[in-house]
Design a protein with these regions (language model features):
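Histidine-acidic metal/acid-base catalytic patches
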Residues: 1-39, 104-105, 140, 169-194, ...
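Active-site acidic/histidine proton-transfer and metal-coordination neighborhood
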Residues: 3-6, 83-191, 201, 287
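Active-site mouth loops of central-metabolism enzymes
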Residues: 11-27, 78-90, 125-131
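Conserved beta-strand positions in the central sheet of alpha/beta enzyme cores
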Residues: 12, 44, 71-73, 109, ...
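Active-site-proximal loop/turn and secondary-structure-junction residues that shape catalytic pockets
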Residues: 17-19, 47-51, 75-78, 112-116, ...
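N-terminal substrate-binding region of glycoside hydrolase catalytic domains
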Residues: 31-52, 73-76
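Glycine-rich, proline-tolerant flexible connector loops at the mouths of alpha/beta enzymes
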Residues: 42-63, 115-119, 162-163
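A short acidic, helix-capping loop that chelates divalent metal ions and anchors anionic groups
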Residues: 77-82, 116-121, 161-165, 232-236, ...
Length: 295
């Protein structure tokens, strides 16, 4: 396993981690500058943040600073109430693939979606099997275009408590089953984004990580870190800083690297009650410290 104790060369910042600083939204161009000031070599930006600044401007700023990407957030949300909605989702994913390519991302992360309308407490239907079928079909269609463009897709399984509203793929095993079905040739164009927050609890985690690495090209395309706090006060927005919770981060990173992953450890922390209320400099400096000591 790589030794992170001496530097933060393999630290990436998911820009959600510092999108709020001292309780206020901060634009992406400022976040990029803050990362550059600290020698952080990679980020994973969100589409809305990129759009607010401008895709071409962000691409130029990243190039000027010599900052790369560890992923691009996000595509997905494939299920819909009707044919028009399904078509619109596919068109939006095409745009996301194009944006990821412009930014030279190594992959587009897919948060696949679930019961359409559930995020607004107005689910169009309750049939989760239908949602999973629409997800499978949406990934298959998007993969065709992704192959043409040369942009790998990374399915991110989410915690089961988000199965109704955000993602109906909830285990690494399920995500890998879809990869094996749609990319039987193991081309490297379809894999997974492994987020500690969502999968740390899974009794099959070590086995499935090893399975992901047993492909011609490892299925592990992105690795997201944070920690699980006890108690967790908000399921979405109370992630912990690495080392503040109960996850065996170093053990899991060992499994991930044994499976062939040699990329960035991407810090993704949603923390409305804590880190988003602190100055961005404090949060980024702590990310560096904990990357070296806890990840």
């Amino acid at each position: 396993m790589r030794d992170f104790s001496g530097n933060h060369d393999w630290l990436s910042i998911n820009t959600a981690t510092v999108r709020k600083q001292s309780g206020a939204e901060v634009p992406l161009d400022r976040i990029i500058d803050q990362c550059a000031e600290r020698g952080i070599r990679a980020i994973s930006p969100w589409r809305d943040q990129v759009a607010a600044v401008g895709l071409d401007k962000v691409a130029k700023q990243l190039k000027a600073h010599g900052i790369g990407l560890s992923g691009y957030c996000r595509g997905g949300f494939f299920p819909a109430a009707d044919a028009a909605g399904l078509k619109a989702a596919l068109e939006d994913n095409r745009r996301a693939i194009d944006e990821a390519k412009t930014l030279d991302a190594p992959c587009l992360v897919l948060v696949v979606g679930a019961l359409p309308g559930a995020l607004e407490s107005k689910a169009a239907y309750k049939d989760i099997a239908r949602a999973r079928s629409e997800v499978r079909d949406g990934i298959a269609a998007s993969l065709e275009y992704a192959r043409e463009v040369g942009m790998p897709l990374a399915i991110e399984p989410l915690h089961p408590m988000q199965a109704a509203d955000r993602a109906c793929i909830n285990t690494l095993e399920h995500a890998l089953d879809i990869c094996d079905e749609l990319d039987a040739g193991q081309s490297g164009m379809l894999g997974v984004a492994l987020d500690i927050y969502h999968v740390w609890w899974d009794p099959k985690l070590q086995q499935q990580i090893a399975r992901a690495g047993n492909a011609k090209h490892t299925r592990l395309l992105a690795y997201h870190v944070c920690d699980w706090l006890t108690p967790t006060r908000d399921l979405l927005s109370d992630r912990g800083m690495m080392g503040d919770g109960v996850v065996e981060l170093k053990k899991i990173r060992g499994w991930v690297e044994d499976a062939g992953f040699a990329g960035f450890s991407e810090v993704e922390i949603f923390s409305n009650l804590d880190w988003w209320q602190r100055p961005g400099a404090e949060t980024l400096d702590m990310c560096i410290e904990r990357h070296c000591s806890a990840v």
